[in-house]
């Protein structure tokens, strides 16, 4: 489950509070900024604030057609650091023309941030129990990549 209480680290190193909410178990759509699951996309038009979509490994942009022009952000969930599909999803969404915020969630920590940033991510929700300040300090550990990026 997405933890909306955690702070958000931007690729420029700034830290901010998360403004997005999820639909609760009661099914009531909250006011303000909302992140929807793929199954909840039918409620997109009713969101009063910013609109975000949570993409898991089961909802590939290759096999699903998302309303990219109606979304302010897409959250890509990393179930485990050794699962590279989230990187591919980010690059694919950028190639498909998504201009909004790409946010990495789930198993996100300092050692993977540069790879995520190079794949097109703008913001990161650092895994609970990991130090967000340490992660921010490591954002520029690698300044000269040897491979092309997105």
Where do the model's predicted regions map?
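N-terminal, charge-rich interaction modules
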Residues: 1-41
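Phosphate/adenylate-binding glycine loop and adjacent helical scaffold
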Residues: 3-17, 46, 57-59, 69, ...
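Structural preference for beta-strand elements that scaffold enzyme active sites
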Residues: 33-35, 50-54, 73-75, 101-103, ...
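Glycine/Thr-rich beta-alpha phosphate-binding loop at enzyme active sites
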Residues: 52-92
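Catalytic cores of alpha/beta
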Residues: 55, 62-66, 110-123
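Glycine-rich beta-to-alpha transition loops that act as phosphate-gripper elements at the mouths
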Residues: 57-58, 103-109
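Glycine-rich phosphate-binding active-site loops on the catalytic face of alpha/beta enzymes
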Residues: 121-139
């Amino acid at each position: 489950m997405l933890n909306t209480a955690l702070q958000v680290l931007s690729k420029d190193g700034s830290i901010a509070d998360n403004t997005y909410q999820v639909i609760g178990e009661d099914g009531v759509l909250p006011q303000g900024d909302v992140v929807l699951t793929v199954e909840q996309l039918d409620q997109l038009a009713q969101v009063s604030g910013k609109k975000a979509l949570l993409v898991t490994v089961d909802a590939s942009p290759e096999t699903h057609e998302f309303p990219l022009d109606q979304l302010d952000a897409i959250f890509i969930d990393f179930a485990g650091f050794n699962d590279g599909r989230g990187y591919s999803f980010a690059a694919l969404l950028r190639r498909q023309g998504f201009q909004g915020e790409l946010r990495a969630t789930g198993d996100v920590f300092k050692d993977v941030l540069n790879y995520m940033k190079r794949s097109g991510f703008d913001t990161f929700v650092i895994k609970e129990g990991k130090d967000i300040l340490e992660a921010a300090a490591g954002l520029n550990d690698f300044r000269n990549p040897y491979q092309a990026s997105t």
